[in-house]
């Protein structure tokens, strides 16, 4: 099965479960669970924004992700909820990170951007303690939202796991998710492959294939799809055979309903014979990542010739 067919089936599932991404009454609650409200909505917005750029306006998938973006924006009351979130949590960065996904697709709220710019100038904002990858993401969120970034990308990149070009054998789950998001931030979610510095691009060209194979073998479908998105975001992607094999394995993991579970354990626990066997939280992110990775892969055909001879690391 091709990446395109995986994408179409996965997007079918997302559209069928659109209402599960809707914000509930707890979206602004003091004890609300951000990971169950704003996180899924923000991830939906980011994936749809990226896919809308990667697909031609004449492509039926383009219209579908645009409709999903409109739905997601309506959930924020056309941006009115972002100033409310800021008033409740002035120094929380997740509202800006979610907003940046919308802003990158042209959905803007000038009032929120003005107030966010004021907060971003404070020492309290600049000194918020964060993991290095998150810091890089906030800097990029500021830029995409029209704010002046509070730091510089090269310095932020140097503090990340990937930026240090670590020994390849130190790769594990947490490092995998960190490196994928570093690449997403550097390339504006796959839009600008040249945003990956040459040394990182060369390093990933050599080590991404074995890491991807390891994750696929372990049935870590969510991380595997993120790594496939990284592969499609590099200046020079991996060998075609690597990607073809990976997509075949992802396709084999995809349920007939279009959903892809985050982990193989969800497949093992799924009751047989059900049309939609996975809990939303067990599959929504990996299914979104499959849409994202497939769109980038389809939009940017793998190069037949690859540069680079040495093996870094």
Where do the protein language model's features map onto the residues?
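Intrinsically disordered, low-complexity segments enriched in charged and polar residues
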Residues: 1, 15-17, 29-30, 59-70, ...
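Terminal, non-catalytic domain-edge segments
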Residues: 1-57, 116-123, 160, 235-313
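N-terminal entry module detector
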Residues: 26-104
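Short beta-strand elements that form the blades of beta-propeller/WD-repeat-like
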Residues: 44-45, 138-139, 183-185, 227, ...
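Eukaryote-skewed repeat-based solenoidal scaffolds used as protein-protein interaction platforms
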Residues: 73-222, 232-234, 247, 251
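Amphipathic alpha-helical protein-interaction segments enriched in hydrophobic
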Residues: 218-229, 283-288
